[in-house]
Amino acid sequence: MAAKDVKFSQDARDRMLRGVDILANAVKVTLGPKGRNVLIERSFGAPRITKDGVTVAKEIQLEDKFENMGAQMLREVASKTNDLAGDGTTTATVLAQSIVREGAKAVAAGMNPMDLKRGIEIAVAAVVKDIEKRAKPVASSAEIAQVGTISSNGDAAIGKMIAQAMQKVGNEGVITVEENKSLTTEVDIVEGMKFDRGYLSPYFVTNAEKMAVEFDDAYVLLHEKKVSGLQSMLPLLEAVVQAGKPLVIIAEDVEGEALATLVVNRLRGGLKVAAVKAPGFGDRRKAMMEDIAILTGGQLISDDLGMKLENVTLKMLGRAKKVVIDKENTTIVGGAGKKADIESRVGQIKAQIEETSSDYDREKLQERLAKLAGGVAVIRVGGATEVEVKEKKDRVEDALNATRAAVQEGIVPGGGVALLRAKKAVGRINNDNADVQAGINIVLKALEAPIRQIAENAGVEGSIVVGKILENKSETFGFDAQTEEYVDMLAKGIVDPAKVVRTALQDAASVSALLVTTEAMVAELPRDAAPAMPGGGGMGGMGGMGF
């Protein structure tokens, strides 16, 4: 085991604080509408330019091991906030830096670190309560667009695009962000349930131009096993013909004779039909078939339930307003399933998402959830260069995460105002223990840090901005750094998701309180360079070779 270097008390805290400051100072320049970019070297390819706090934090590695430990703890704040809320990473870093700095000063002045920690926790709980009380539910598409605009650094086009996508696929729908090959950024929306299985025979095609099967008001038969003969299905097929509606068969497979018979009937025009293989594999296939059954209001014909094809009636079939099948995909739009059944299934899948520990399973469950809940939207980000596309994609992802958070827990006035106004709630707390009170005061000071930083990045003195806002009694009065004016933040559309503000403070306080209570630090000693290899001795002269 390698030898260790150990630092104690003030020496340890000073080193740690230096690391915290280096990382925080690099991250906090990106905060607010007038925040600057950070250029990051890549081991290969062009450097990356970004305004995303967590991206900057993840790239920082310091040479001094003790400073690096402080920086890595702060990086943990940004990562945790990013995982939970998807945005607010720079705010969390600024808050953490302020709490660690003030905490280190208090410990140096002889205060008890554990009491300070308790004070920090009491104050944070009061702020969280205050934020939850002030949060206003997001109702309209315009409000969603505002959140998206602020989180993408004032890009109204991105805000509008996210609002459009959310309106189309619903709050539960899946929205993904991809890079576009062209200059433009666009939204591509797939409504209904789409899965990656196409028609089993091109003879089913109804639209020759698009090479697709297009059925309106169709019946959907869901069969768990293979369909090899049509004898057992004849009564059902006759009933479908009499009803005059098209039929889509989704089964494990439709084999030889059965497929040939369906194709012949389709070509003769007597039966509008198309057959598709069931999506997925194994247990996941069954679950997806059940999803389709619930979406279309039909029943999955399964041996487990003692159901046979010959006993199937029209009532057991699902219904859909439109079914489109091409060579590779099937889309079911407007299923006739009951809303209550669909909601119950969505709840079931959400519970499974919470329980699973596998990322792969979680991804597949989220796909199923999106298909049931309304659809999938893809935002394709374009730009003139690869560097520009990557920078814009970072902002779109932040904006998307922020709008999701806003839908979950509502919005509060942005620009650091919500935290600044929460000072009133913290100011009301009085504790008999002076050290605990000092911990509360540390948070009181930290609540000003984000708004000060936003102002300073805009070239305005932070203290003046804080003073002016606190003088005004309106809860939504704040500083618009973009125009450098004092405005009503909600009326101007400068809002933050309550979840992002709350998570940023909780994560910052959690890690900072641990850093403040650190008394010793242990790191590996740098290994001495291995001794150089000794030089090779001169070779003796070779004797002459006699012939």
Swiss-Prot record:
<dbReference type="Pfam" id="PF00118">
    <property type="entry name" value="Cpn60_TCP1"/>
</dbReference>
<dbReference type="InterPro" id="IPR027410">
    <property type="entry name" value="TCP-1-like_intermed_sf"/>
</dbReference>
<dbReference type="GO" id="GO:0005524">
    <property type="term" value="F:ATP binding"/>
</dbReference>
<keyword id="KW-0143">Chaperone</keyword>
<dbReference type="GO" id="GO:0042026">
    <property type="term" value="P:protein refolding"/>
</dbReference>
<dbReference type="InterPro" id="IPR027409">
    <property type="entry name" value="GroEL-like_apical_dom_sf"/>
</dbReference>
<dbReference type="GO" id="GO:0051082">
    <property type="term" value="F:unfolded protein binding"/>
</dbReference>
<dbReference type="InterPro" id="IPR002423">
    <property type="entry name" value="Cpn60/GroEL/TCP-1"/>
</dbReference>
<feature type="binding site">
    <location>
        <position position="51"/>
    </location>
    <ligand>
        <name>ATP</name>
    </ligand>
</feature>
<dbReference type="InterPro" id="IPR027413">
    <property type="entry name" value="GROEL-like_equatorial_sf"/>
</dbReference>
<keyword id="KW-0067">ATP-binding</keyword>
<feature type="binding site">
    <location>
        <begin position="30"/>
        <end position="33"/>
    </location>
    <ligand>
        <name>ATP</name>
    </ligand>
</feature>
<dbReference type="GO" id="GO:0016853">
    <property type="term" value="F:isomerase activity"/>
</dbReference>
<comment type="function">
    <text>Together with its co-chaperonin GroES, plays an essential role in assisting protein folding. The GroEL-GroES system forms a nano-cage that allows encapsulation of the non-native substrate proteins and provides a physical environment optimized to promote and accelerate protein folding.</text>
</comment>
<dbReference type="InterPro" id="IPR018370">
    <property type="entry name" value="Chaperonin_Cpn60_CS"/>
</dbReference>
<feature type="binding site">
    <location>
        <position position="415"/>
    </location>
    <ligand>
        <name>ATP</name>
    </ligand>
</feature>
<feature type="binding site">
    <location>
        <position position="496"/>
    </location>
    <ligand>
        <name>ATP</name>
    </ligand>
</feature>
<feature type="binding site">
    <location>
        <begin position="87"/>
        <end position="91"/>
    </location>
    <ligand>
        <name>ATP</name>
    </ligand>
</feature>
<dbReference type="InterPro" id="IPR001844">
    <property type="entry name" value="Cpn60/GroEL"/>
</dbReference>
<dbReference type="GO" id="GO:0140662">
    <property type="term" value="F:ATP-dependent protein folding chaperone"/>
</dbReference>
<dbReference type="GO" id="GO:0005737">
    <property type="term" value="C:cytoplasm"/>
</dbReference>
<comment type="subunit">
    <text>Forms a cylinder of 14 subunits composed of two heptameric rings stacked back-to-back. Interacts with the co-chaperonin GroES.</text>
</comment>
<keyword id="KW-0547">Nucleotide-binding</keyword>
<keyword id="KW-0413">Isomerase</keyword>
<keyword id="KW-0963">Cytoplasm</keyword>
<comment type="similarity">
    <text>Belongs to the chaperonin (HSP60) family.</text>
</comment>
<protein>
    <recommendedName>
        <fullName>Chaperonin GroEL 1</fullName>
        <ecNumber>5.6.1.7</ecNumber>
    </recommendedName>
</protein>
